[in-house]
Amino acid sequence: MNDSEFHRLADALWLTIEERLDNWDGDSDIDCEINGGVLTLSFENGSKIIINRQEPLHQVWLATKQGGYHFDLKGDEWVCDRSGETFWDLLEQAATQQAGEKVSFR
């Protein structure tokens, strides 16, 4: 994958997260902000989830209260380079914990 393809895929991921949060009807308020290629989810309790892109590595990084994760594209899925879990699984787990209620991005 070249840099422009990586940015196209990362932009699509950011857009999907935004759209799914816009359609989410949970009780908690989750704010989504994109600034300089970094996507920040802010929760009512003051906690945050930070998602950014690492262009030189063609990775997406996810920072949560539980820890940091690095994802490589494998086929059509962003997969954690340590655990093998998908981006969506880890994002949902972290968002659910930080929101205090079930959050789904699917």
Swiss-Prot record:
<dbReference type="GO" id="GO:0005829">
    <property type="term" value="C:cytosol"/>
</dbReference>
<keyword id="KW-0479">Metal-binding</keyword>
<dbReference type="InterPro" id="IPR036524">
    <property type="entry name" value="Frataxin/CyaY_sf"/>
</dbReference>
<dbReference type="GO" id="GO:0008198">
    <property type="term" value="F:ferrous iron binding"/>
</dbReference>
<comment type="similarity">
    <text>Belongs to the frataxin family.</text>
</comment>
<comment type="function">
    <text>Involved in iron-sulfur (Fe-S) cluster assembly. May act as a regulator of Fe-S biogenesis.</text>
</comment>
<dbReference type="InterPro" id="IPR002908">
    <property type="entry name" value="Frataxin/CyaY"/>
</dbReference>
<dbReference type="Pfam" id="PF01491">
    <property type="entry name" value="Frataxin_Cyay"/>
</dbReference>
<dbReference type="InterPro" id="IPR047584">
    <property type="entry name" value="CyaY"/>
</dbReference>
<dbReference type="GO" id="GO:0016226">
    <property type="term" value="P:iron-sulfur cluster assembly"/>
</dbReference>
<dbReference type="InterPro" id="IPR020895">
    <property type="entry name" value="Frataxin_CS"/>
</dbReference>
<protein>
    <recommendedName>
        <fullName>Iron-sulfur cluster assembly protein CyaY</fullName>
    </recommendedName>
</protein>
<keyword id="KW-0408">Iron</keyword>
<dbReference type="GO" id="GO:0008199">
    <property type="term" value="F:ferric iron binding"/>
</dbReference>
